[in-house]
Amino acid sequence: MRKERDAMNIHSCHRSKPAVLVQLVLILSWLTHIQMTDTYFYVCALIACGGIFCTCENYRHNLPRSRGTWIRVLLFSAVFSLSSILGNYSLFEPFTSLTNLFRMALSFLGGLSLGGNVLAYLLWVFPGLQAAEEKRNHPGRVFALSFGVIVLIDLVYLLLVEWPGVLTRDSMDQIRQIITGKYSNANPYWHTVTVGIFVKLGLLVTGDLHWGVALFSIFQILYLAGCFSYAVMTLYQKGAPRWCLWAVWAGYALIPYQIVYSVTVWKDILFSGASLLLTVALYRLLYPVEKEEKRDWILFVLGGAGLCLWRTNGLLVIAMLLMALALAGRKNKKLAAVLAVILVIGLVLCGPVLSLMGIRGAGLAETLSIPLQQVARVCYDGAAIAREDLELIRTVAEPEEFAGVYQSYLSDPVKGLLRRSAGYEQLKADPLPYLKLWLRMGLRHPISYLKAWIDQTKGYWNAGYSYWITAEGIYENEFGLVSRPGNIVGTVFDKLMRYAELMPLMHPLFSIGLYTWLTGICCFVNRQRRRPEWLLSLPWLVILFGLLIGTPVYAEFRYAYPVMLA
């Protein structure tokens, strides 16, 4: 790493003290202008402190005059700065005010300075984590210890608090499909089949549905513990400092939402584990840590298969990773070939096979979350709508109805209005006029469209929002599935979880946007250094892209669980 940095420092310069002071003032200005934000302000303050530290450190070092690199650094920083303004646009309204425009300009320059200094520090100053000098000859012991303790913690939680597992409305829909044999792909069919293997086994052996659900919960505990321990073992073998190993292990084992998710029957949990499995296996194949790679190849294939089958956007992740590997060079030919096979099999299983089985998807409305929100926002804002557009809107509902059900952070009410309308069938039969309607209204009301998009997606790229993270118990059902009555252990754990969510010091653990930007920074820095680790960031960035164009909820933590793990 030091050689790479030295190579980039051939032409360097030292910045003047006044310039550094101006940048520090701008960073503080950025923080001051968003102090009334509805996001996690502590996360913003933490980011600002990081920017101040990096600015001071950069002042003590000579930075290169690499024009191309600096342009890319400034472009990346501009995107960060602009996103912080857009995510808090309500603090700068009305936009016609000269004072607010001046505040926006200062805030933008502050974010630009903050981002630029952080990236410059990571590219040219940060020495990197030093690998441990002692020999690491016991990876098996590390894996076994990590695995055993995580399994023990999660099993205790399952047995004492959430037996036989946590089942929400979506989970109960999957259980209903398994019991009745009437399947759909609203929740991924192959995930439902995976749950069904354990549910049916439990019913076969005990005749009790509770044991069927419990068997799946136990499988998920073992699966996640294995994925987590595989990551910890890899860091151990690569010489990560002991404090880093303990911090990563504690993040997997002790953060409350990790424990709850281990027994929650959601597609997102297994999918996120597969994302971590694929990422770690890919890293080990790019940088072999053992002479025998057969196990890593097997886990790489299993992780890729899980991504393809357990959530619909997994196929896009594999496709983009395949393209990146193909463009990265011939030395990745074997990896690309394996991914290509995984992708083809996934496409067949999720396409023609489901069609032949007569299994239908979630419906058109589920793919229209953001377009529907944008049209509803125009109605909500009371903007003037052209007569031709008004007539087409009324085939679904009156503008007043759209305005009445619109919620800026959730598309379900608007989607429900669409499904109940007589115009829904017309939309499915002939979507082109409605597409043209959406485009015309966007050109006439760009501000309303932009606000609707920001409010619907900002939880995934802004500093973080207080929104539900975990579920508990079993959703009301007709199968007699009930949770175990509450006890003192469950009460204490629930209070700890709530306190953790409320404590500002813990907010970085719950900030999706913080993890998103950290992932983006890792991708950018590694790409600039021409290190293949940038590929490890792709799974989350592709998932993020899918959320930005179609999320139904503005800050659904489980949707972002892959980045929390990886």
Spell out what each predicted region is.
Residues 218-239:
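Transmembrane-helix motifs of polytopic, lipid-linked glycan transferases
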Residues 162-174, 182-198, 202-211:
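Extracytoplasmic catalytic/substrate-binding loops of multi-pass membrane glycan-assembly enzymes
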Residues 27-46, 211-215, 452-537:
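Membrane-interface anchor segments at the N-terminal boundary of transmembrane helices
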